[in-house]
A protein has these predicted regions:
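Membrane-proximal N-terminal amphipathic helix
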Residues: 41-70, 269
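Short, aromatic/His-centered strand-loop micro-motif at the edge of beta-sheets
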Residues: 185-219
Length: 337
């Protein structure tokens, strides 16, 4: 007879082993929950969200050398970063007026100068009546200047008589006056008591007489951010005016020169920017803004807080559902902490 083999031990845990394993798992799980609670990713996410939106606006201000802003809505928890974005540039290397955005133009009577501000330039000096250039911007919906804009160009006049250099679809423009002054203007949108929007009278700024001379290139910049209309010549502000109105829509072509009286000079390096939403975000449901948060944070062209509005660092408070609080600090140089 063959001896009976003793059956092998079945695989598995004894009761004691099972209790020990469950105890270890419970201990590890408890430690993990504690660590996650301490980390609180929801709170960190809300804090990082606000910081990132502020940094995005500041970076835009520095990159474009133009003001940028962040709007905070305590009621909805919405954060909107707004800054300048280039809509189109024209370098006038050909009479086809090739635009960077595909918005090419038509030139009547103008000629190209080889010694422009940057490369070639478009000139109407000595051109016959009716000479001008135009680009049909009113057909491009992306050219929306409602929240603000920036116009940059180089001008060189050959006559002290001056003339109209630029008219952006009857919404904004630049003029050179015969007394040597510069004028920048825009047309605001006004809304009646019944809610009907229409074009208002122009808002304009004029420099002191004698800021420009015939025969020299000058760099002209006009900036409007629904707070200040600024006019700068060769990097120096020469005029400003306060306004908070939105800009009226572009409803006609961009006109370079004047069909009635040709511009007595040349233009080069034209760029048009508009204020656009560069980012939007909403705080998580369990987080809200503190009641004392500023509704708008404005960064200057150099990235610092606008010194006309803020003389000290800004504190933006966040309040959490569990009663905890946190703050984001923006110092006077625009650094977000």
């Amino acid at each position: 007879m063959r001896p009976l083999l003793q059956s092998g031990r079945r695989a598995g845990f004894t009761l004691i082993e099972l209790i020990v394993v469950m105890g270890l798992m419970a201990m590890l799980f408890g430690i993990g929950v504690g660590m996650l609670t301490a980390l609180n990713p929801g709170k960190r996410a809300a804090l990082g969200l606000v910081q990132n939106m502020l940094r995005s606006a500041r970076n835009n201000a520095v990159a474009r050398s133009a003001p940028a802003r962040v709007r905070l809505d305590p009621a909805s928890g919405e954060i909107v970063a707004m800054g300048m974005d280039v809509l189109g540039t024209w370098q006038f290397e050909t009479l086809g007026l090739d635009g960077s955005s595909g918005d090419d133009g038509v030139c009547t009577g103008g000629v190209l100068l080889d010694d422009g501000f940057l490369g070639k330039a478009l000139s109407f000096e000595g051109a016959p009546a009716g000479s001008h250039a135009e680009v049909a911007l009113q057909e491009n919906p992306s050219f929306d200047l409602r929240e603000g804009f920036m116009l940059q160009c180089a001008l060189k006049l050959e006559s002290p008589d001056g003339g109209r250099a630029l008219d952006v679809g009857r919404a904004a423009g630049i003029e050179c006056r015969s007394n040597g002054s510069l004028r920048a203007w825009f047309r605001p949108q006004v809304t009646s008591a019944s809610g009907v929007a229409s074009s208002g009278g122009i808002v304009a700024v004029d420099s002191e007489p004698g800021v420009w001379r015939a025969g020299y290139w000058m760099r002209v910049e006009v900036t409007y951010d629904r707070r200040i209309l600024r006019l700068a010549l060769d990097g120096v502000e020469v005029a400003r005016a306060a306004s908070a109105e939105p800009v009226w829509k572009i409803e006609a072509p961009l006109m370079i020169g004047d069909a009635r009286a040709p511009f007595p000079g040349a233009i080069d390096a034209l760029s048009i920017y508009a204020v656009v939403d560069s980012g939007k975000a909403v705080l998580p449901r369990a987080v809200s803004f503190a009641p004392d948060v500023p509704r708008e944070i404005v960064f200057s062209a150099d990235g610092s807080l606008d010194r006309e509005l803020f003389s000290a660092p800004l504190s933006i408070g966040l309040e959490y559902e569990d009663g905890a609080k946190a703050r984001v600090i923006v110092n006077v140089y625009g650094t977000v902490e």
